[in-house]
Amino acid sequence: MTTSAPPVRDELFGPSRRAVTVGILLLISLIAFEAMGVGTAMPAIVADLASVASYSWPFVAFIAPMVVGTVLGGRWCDARGPRAVLLLAPALFGLGLLVGGTAGTMAQLLVGRVLQGFGAGAQGVAVYVLIALVYSERARPAVFGLVSSAWVLPSLIGPPVSGLVTEHLSWHWVFLGLLPLVLLAVGLVFPAVRGLSVPAPGERGPARRSTVAAAFAAAAG
């Protein structure tokens, strides 16, 4: 007599996986918001910082380091596993939010955006590696489907939310308001991350394939 496998939904949102699933989706949503949702606040930002001519630079300062972070984060995950990346990258992303959110000059804002982008890239690829390690093969398509939604949703609701925050509070809170969510996301994924081990040299073949696939997925967004 054989027992049937539990439904995929139970693996994603059952007691043992609910926290890490929500944490993963939150981490990706935060990246997507910073990549696409802050555009509504940018006119107010450049006007406040008297840098209208530099309008495009905050976007470039996020996207270019994000690509670098994706590559370097993937290499680190390949060599040492995703555990350290999933702790350090959100910290770097959060530091970028703090620096950008307290910016009084365009130079400081650009530094914050560089930190955000680099942390987001490394964080994104590490999330994809974590999915490959934590979830069963039959559950991964469902997880990746949810992750795709986590990329799309901020592009739809991010701009109006960013506009409302900018109008009723300040553009600074478009960055600072995400800091508690970063802490929450790290707290949710930490139990799963803590149990991951560093891959031995002989085990890095499968890990490398997962990391390469994750890097492409993260770069594609």
Model feature map: region roles:
Residues 2-190:
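Transmembrane-helix bundle of Major Facilitator Superfamily
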Residues 168-221:
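Hydrophobic transmembrane-helix bundles of small-molecule transporters
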